Amino acid sequence: MKKIGLFLLLGFSLSWLVSACQERQQERRKEVPLDSIVLSDPCILADRKTAMYYMTGTGGMLWKSKDLKLWEGPFHVAKTDSGSWMGPKPMIWAAELHPYKGKYYYFATFTNQAVKIDTVQGNVIERRASHVLVSDNPDGPYVPMKDSTYLPADKPTLDGTFWVDKDGKPYMVYCYEWLQALDGTIEKIELKPDLSGTIGEGKLLFRASESPWSREKDADGKDKPNKVTDGPYLFRTGTGRLGMIWTSWIYNVYTQGVAYSESGTLDGPWIQEKDPITPPDFGHGMLFQTLDGKWLMSVHRHKDVNGRYIRIPRLFEVDFSGDKLMVGKLYIP
């Protein structure tokens, strides 16, 4: 149990190091192959207005490409308010780009390491929350909107994503972090019509422990479901089913699964598929359609290279034209 907790905390340290290194790396490069970019939580927007691909993730940077093969970047696109709760230099994790009603929105996790909100089982918890920035252009700059907070200040949240449900209302779907929750959750909260803030309170969708495939050891060395929820992303199949990919761990192996809503709405109930959806050490996925109409899944590969954990973007072919999401072979642009 202690080893698993240490491993997970090292994973958070890795995210911080990736974020810090990317923020320091200001030199812009051209014609960089996708597999030469070190990036956690890659999210790709295929923008038809500009006929370009825009990739973001952890670190607050953005990359551009015309063909998915060669990329230019990194560009610093997130312009936060130093006077806000985020502080002057927040860590930025798992950024996503979402076009909506003529604008582009930057959903990301921001952490102010100078502010401590809780201590649980010896773990000091920093001020961390999902938040939304806005821009008129896909390559930014992305700036704050009206509301200074989207989620409670005393609750660590992360990996917010965007979904418009059957009621026509926009929602943020996010993780309540296991460090405080102990059994991490995925929740939803309604957004204002212009996404400038939230309405009401968050609602539980499911808990990490509901997963039939994730695993960790308890204090007695016995197997139990893992406590981590990470990287939710929503989609609708060709038959109208609402699905969600999300990531956890099988012991020390980063693993992605999928759940489906029986009601076809965010309210669920959510039924977890028995087996993971992608191979071991691939996770934090999202789905996008290429400019020529092909559906792909963007993930990062989590691997150990001589004791250093490296995360690199990878693409998989996918098909969800039927009743379920089917993940095919690796796609090489």
What are these regions (language model features)?
Residues 1-27:
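Bacterial Sec-dependent N-terminal signal peptides
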Residues 21-333:
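Carbohydrate-active catalytic/glycan-binding domains of CAZyme proteins
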